[in-house]
Amino acid sequence: MYNMQAIVRKNINNTTMQFEKLGYIATNLTNYSTSAYKTSRFEQILREDGYIDGAIRTNVRQGDIRISRDPYDVAIDGHGYFPVVSADGEVQYTRDGAFKRGSNGYLMTSDDWMVGDGIKIPANCYKFEIRPNGDVISYDKAGSLPEKIGTIPLVEFDSPESLEQGHNNKMVITEESGMPRIIKSDQGIRQYATEVSNTNIYDEINDMMRMNSSMIASMQLMKVANDMYSKSINITE
C-alpha cells in the first residue's frame, strides 16, 4: 500500500509539472505576434527519487528582422537588450524596439517606459536618425548640421537564458543571469526595423500534443490506482 501511495504522489507531482509546462506553451503561442518576444521553455528534471522538478529557461535565439516605415522602430541585430526605466524608476530589459516619442518628448517604449537614461527629441526636430552604434542624431531643418541628442544603450548578460519574464515583454535579471554590461560596438542597432517573435508554432503545437498524451497517461494511471484502492478496501471489508 505504501508503494502505491508513493506512485500516486509522484504521478500528482508529474501531472502538476505537465500543466505548468502547458501554461508556458500557451503563453508562447499567445505572443506569436508580439515584437521581439522570446519564448520560455519549461525544462523537466527527473530526480533520483522519481519526482520531477522544473526549470524555466528563455530561448534567446534572435527572431527575424522585419523592415518598417516608422523611424521610431529599432531592432537589435545580434545579442543584447535595451535597458528601459519605468516612471517609478524600475529598470527592466527588452528587445522590443517599437518605440515612440512620449508626451514629454522622450524616447519611450509603447507602454511609456523611458529608453536608457533618457533621450529627449527636440520639439523643432525636422528629422532624426538612429545610427548602428545607437547614437541618436537630430536635424532641426533640411540641410542643417546634425546634433547628437543621446545614445540608445545595449547591454548583455553572462546567462541571458536565465532572465525571467517581466512586465509586458520585458525581462528582469536573476542571480543566474548575472548583472548587465554595456556593449561597446559600432554595430547592432537598425532603425526602420523590428524583430519578430522567435515563437515556432509547429514546435509549440508538437510540445502541446506530447503534453496532452502524457496527461492522458497520467490520468489512466490514477484510474488504475483508484481501482486498486477500491478493491483493497472491498477485500478488507
Predicted regions and their residues:
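Amphipathic alpha-helical polymerization modules
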Residues: 1-237
